[in-house]
Regions:
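N-terminal Sec-pathway targeting helices
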Residues: 1-11
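Hydrophobic h-region of N-terminal signal peptides that target proteins for export
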Residues: 12-21
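Boundary/entry segment of secreted carbohydrate-active catalytic domains
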Residues: 22-58, 62-64, 77-80, 90, ...
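Chitinase-like catalytic core of GlcNAc-active glycosidases
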Residues: 35-38, 71-185
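Active-site beta-loop-alpha junctions enriched in small/polar residues
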Residues: 43-47, 66, 97-101, 139-141, ...
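Conserved, mostly hydrophobic/aromatic
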Residues: 61, 136, 188
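Substrate-binding surface in catalytic domains of secreted glycosidases
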Residues: 156-224
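C-terminal active-site rim and adjoining tail of enzyme catalytic domains
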Residues: 198-261
Length: 261
């Protein structure tokens, strides 16, 4: 085979490899769907919650299981203290909130031992009753992103293959920041509430039927029950709902107005 033909073959092979690589990224797994989670997930934060009246066929529950604070070269654990009541058949996601400089006022060391301790503590939440998925909630400063990426990579490697791994993401990350690309998670839930300075710009962006540029952010939405939002939701995506108080049966009516069946 002469040089010209060999070059054509190599280019064709590269094109095919690129095509299938793109297809693989587009069709990456979503273990949350594979595990049959309902389309609506109620966030249950650190307060007493009685969700036993909510239909587990329609609602899953993502509850705050623990808060982990990166302080210096240590990890400080604060477990959940408030009671959570759900139906026995409810699908549960254990949420770990990770905090650092905004809470402590000092930069964390971000060393390997901290990452390993985080992984160990997060893995333990999988042992809680009826938990079948994990979610990580954090605010990643630019200087912390490599640390969080390595944390998620190690966590995914240690988790059983079928267990979903979810994370929350600032909506601004989903619109114009590519650091989420290729993270080993099943979804990055865009937090479309309490957005501060970005609030109006992002809500206008979505109201004009624009979509998040990051594919991991196109599998779900995160909204608050007490914040008006005019964008039309893609009904194929999962909806995470935050309430600024304990959930009550009367909230179902408000849910019906905000969420598609």
């Amino acid at each position: 085979m002469n040089l010209g033909k060999r070059l054509l073959v190599m280019l064709a092979a590269l094109a095919i490899a690129t095509f299938f690589s793109a297809k693989t990224k587009t069709l990456s797994r979503n273990r949350i769907d594979e595990n049959g989670f309902p389309r609506i997930v109620l966030w249950a934060w650190e307060r007493p919650e009685d969700l036993s009246t909510f239909d587990p066929q329609r609602f899953a529950v993502a509850f705050l299981a623990q808060t982990l604070i990166l302080k210096g070269d240590d990890v400080v654990l604060t477990p959940r203290h408030q009671p959570l009541k759900v139906r026995p058949e409810a699908k549960l996601i254990a949420v770990t909130r990770i905090e650092s400089q905004k809470t402590t006022g000092e930069r964390p060391a971000l060393i390997d031992l901290q990452r390993q301790k985080l992984v160990m503590l997060i893995m333990r939440t999988l042992e809680l009753k009826n938990v079948s998925a994990l979610q990580i909630d954090f605010d990643a400063a630019s200087s912390e992103r490599l640390f969080y990426r390595s944390l998620l990579q190690e966590l995914r490697q240690k988790l059983p293959d079928k267990v979903p791994l979810s994370m929350t993401a600032l909506a601004s990350f989903c619109v114009g920041d590519r650091w989420l690309q290729d993270l080993p998670v099943d979804e990055a839930v865009p937090m479309i509430f309490r957005m501060g300075a970005d609030d109006q710009a992002i809500k206008r962006f979505l109201a004009h039927r624009e979509d998040f540029r990051e594919p991991l952010c196109r599998r779900s939405y995160g909204i608050a029950l007490d914040e008006p939002f005019e964008a039309k939701f893609d009904t194929s995506r999962r909806l995470y709902l935050f309430n600024n108080r304990s959930w009550m049966t009367s909230d179902i009516a408000a849910l019906e107005e905000r969420t598609p069946r």
